[in-house]
């Protein structure tokens, strides 16, 4: 299966002198450009996101970090440090979500941790407080996957009427330090 992100609109001869961004804004009239978005999940220092482009206006992404809650995913070790997959996947998911927002996309962060935010530490400490948009994450793997599926589908039923392009992005990280 191949997924394509919508192409950036290029200025044609008819729009010469206008920037690609201006052309994208014109085609996205029902998605007015926001200048800033506030997302507390990014952490105290990064919660305000400056929207620098409108090229992803009209798109909606469901960003899902792997594991979380009672399931840390793969666990690797570096010296005395344990590396828990869910913490790194969550950090990467937040960074991706923030970048998508800077480009004008609407982003739904499915797995959430109100405390962690985007972290700069080399070794991220583990926690079990992640939720699926406020709901506790089940221990049972099938229930966990079903919970995420149900949440994304419920959001999509509403979002597909408003956005021309909706996609889910799932992030997993293998933190084992030796070959598989």
Give residue spans per PLM region.
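Catalytic-site microenvironment of enzymes
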Residues: 1-180
